[in-house]
Amino acid sequence: MCDYGTRPKLSRRSLIAGASTFLTAGMLPRFGARAEDKEAAPNAIPPSEALERLKAGNARFAADGGKDIDFSAKRAARVKAEQPIAGILSCSDSRVPPEIIFDQRPGDLFVSRNAGNVVSSYGLASFEFAVTSLGIPLIMVLGHKGCGVVLSALAASTQRKELPGHLPELVKAIEPAVITAHGKHPSDFLAASIEENVRLGMKRLKTKSKIIGEAVMAGKLKIAGGVYDLETGVVK
């Protein structure tokens, strides 16, 4: 017989121990997935093929808005596992949705977004997970024309404009790209800074993560970059 009037006492230590067991049993096995699982995965394709798929998808989107994708299709299959063909580090700008821009289905892209498409420690960890556990063959850093955060970095760098809250920290991460662009004396300072920020992101992905860097050196992973044109829909 159950005694519903008596509740077991749980100490803080027992709760922590239980949570630790759950994490170990439920999450950690995903890291270092079996080789045979990765070989059978649909995303086990060369980096060059993954990049070509993105290019083809963007061409479709820019031409006619892309395919009429049923986002509910194959929902049951996606519950079992995710097998994205690429990782995308994109700006948070609401006009720059990677899945739509590249005309991809749910489950095709592993996306990390923040204002200014900046490489952060959390972003690095996310892509390290995608490389080691999901086997993505490609990571693209995606900037866009007219990026407001890069414009703020320009103002902070050239006009010494003060920014509120945590914005200075974000702008500081972009400032090296602005300085590099300024040294090249471009006719369009903002456009050049946006492009340099993409290049900076690509470099940081390879140099700040041993996991990502080694995957690139081994030829298993490619780091690419692009700038999205809001007017034409084209990524270059």
Where are the model-predicted features located?
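Short glycine-/acidic-enriched loop or helix-start segments at secondary-structure transitions
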Residues: 27, 98-99, 150-152
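Short beta-strand segments
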Residues: 89-91, 113, 140-144, 224-229
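Sec/Tat signal peptide C-region and signal peptidase I cleavage site
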Residues: 31-34
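Gly/Ser/Thr-rich loops at beta-strand to alpha-helix junctions
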Residues: 94-95, 144-149
